């Protein structure tokens, strides 16, 4: 699918901001580089490096068939002997790892200002300074490079020579696995557990899955580490339920770290690259691990959605809660609620302030609703929180038809954004405030226009750096009924 005009504008702003300083440096070095090229031409000719392919990981904001220049310098070219990551040349995850953190934030800020320029001009506001990890753009002093912030780590497995089990990251643009001794942005210890799983599989002769031949057993592993707790959960993805030496294998995995409380097996026998299958069972320990956000406790099941960067998640959720302005007796609808984290944090915050509200969460995934109901009970909110397994658009259309009361609406849709029907019904319900969290500002910008046309004004929009060292930015918008 070709990029839209808004997407191209966002990309162009990132490129210009990220490369502005590099142009000054390159102009000073042009003469010396030309001399060097002349000398090297007399020596042994070297083959040119093929053009690098675009990064296609989760942090990419759009997909396009057009040639795409990464908004940060190519990881393959940016590496130096002092790089904090030993595999930065091959890994496509942290393409800006070698850039100063302040410059990363400045590039993202420029992109968001470009993307939301029309909306901001229409509303007479400016995009707030981006909230980085431990720092806001514009703050004086140093901007330390974030490390160890990803509390979810994963690996694919592939067969090696003589029964070896290979694990690590896919090399950028390929399905070739690059070994990862450690990852500077993952929670400490997570990568050691993943590498240990491969060694235990080798020891017990459990073959890795070959995705081309569709043979073998061990496909993936996911490690999730608590932030406010020290609990760890491991999910093993296998091609079938039965494994040789299964009990020994599960116990060996559980013994890799004393903080592992859950080992789960997910069975995925389908062809293709999807990581998880439909069946999951607990093979060691508790059904869930536990973590905390903004004073709320959350049980996290093996396949539940839970933010990868909990430190920035707390910041993002607090911005949303502040924007809600909840009052006594309000009805808060949490659309696309997942396991209920945003709504429950807001309800707990209101309760702690002595403000009674009613929370209604809507999520189409039944597993997410089951987690949300369990988490409501865990936080003593069962009497004031209800969660419905339904499509958000279908539910809000019915609510609008029945003229139901909604005082505050919280939206956190998938990357595709919301639907026109949902937004039209949201405007018909006339909530006093709307908070819109987005993992894709391009689709959020599109949706905000419809909300403004439907009778709302944009109070503020704040970028949040959820994934440092990438070009990914999340945003929170706060709207009020005119």
Q: For each predicted feature, which ranges?
A:
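Short edge beta-strands and adjacent turn/loop segments
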Residues: 215-228
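Solvent-exposed residues in well-ordered beta-strands and their adjoining turns
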Residues: 156-158, 224, 237-239, 480-482
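Short helix/loop segment immediately N-terminal to the Walker
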Residues: 207-215, 332
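Short, aliphatic-rich beta-strand segments
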Residues: 223, 230-239, 297-301
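Nucleotide donor/acceptor-binding cores
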Residues: 151, 230-232, 329-330
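Rossmann-like S-adenosyl-L-methionine
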Residues: 3-29, 35-38, 42-43, 48-54, ...
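Short beta-strand elements
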Residues: 148-171, 223-225, 281, 287-293, ...
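Extended interfacial segments that mediate partner engagement and assembly in macromolecular machines
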Residues: 78-82, 89-208, 228, 243
